[in-house]
Regions:
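Soluble FAD-dependent oxygen oxidases
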Residues: 1-194
């Protein structure tokens, strides 16, 4: 577990945390929910940037050279159960994972973002329109295909916490429609036969 933590509330807080960690040569970790099966967000002995309280979200019409249509902006603390509910209230859906308590912005999107709707809409990284981030040198910026495009592409699928600390993500929203799913389970009552 982290030895120290900063409850992040702004870009300035992140920049101060980054500066502190650099000046004192302290390992830095970034954590929202901690859903990481290899524990990268825990960082033993690190200074943790706890992103969980960046939980603003909004739905709006987005316009850029590459996409015009409905979109959702989610703070780094948003979990899927939060955004799924709010998206339904706006008549749209956003891509997400199966587990509703996973955070949307960190490792999910920045590691590609596979989920139940990927066959219909692509991976979450393919639906990401922009990232609001703080770079290691403390710059607060937007990364999109037209603004800071190298950082945008790096954040889109190279893993969370690798290139910048992401404060929010803007992702395409799709018109809500009916979906179907199935669950298949086999029960083996004989432990000698698998």
């Amino acid at each position: 577990m982290a030895s120290y933590a900063i409850d992040v509330d702004s870009a300035a807080t992140v920049a101060a945390g980054l500066k502190f960690a650099q000046e004192r040569n302290v390992r830095l970790s970034i954590k929202n929910t901690g859903h990481d099966y290899i524990g990268r967000s825990n960082g033993r002995g690190s200074l943790a940037l706890w992103m969980h309280n960046l939980n603003d979200m909004s739905f709006f019409n987005y316009s850029s050279p590459g996409y015009t249509g409905p979109a959702a902006k989610a703070g780094a603390g948003i979990q899927f159960f939060d955004i799924y509910r709010e998206a339904a209230n706006h008549g749209v859906r956003v891509l997400g994972g199966y587990c509703p308590s996973v955070g949307m912005v960190g490792g999910y999107v920045q590691s590609g973002g596979h989920g139940p709707l990927a066959a219909s809409y692509g991976m979450a990284a393919d639906n990401t329109l922009e990232f609001e981030a703080v770079t290691v040198d403390g710059r607060h910026l937007i990364a999109s295909p037209t603004q800071n495009p190298d950082l945008y592409w790096a954040l889109s699928d190279e893993g969370a916490g690798t290139y910048a600390v992401v404060l929010s993500t803007t992702i395409k929203a799709h018109v809500d429609d009916s979906t179907a799913g199935a669950f298949f389970s086999l029960l083996n009552t004989n432990p000698d036969k698998y």
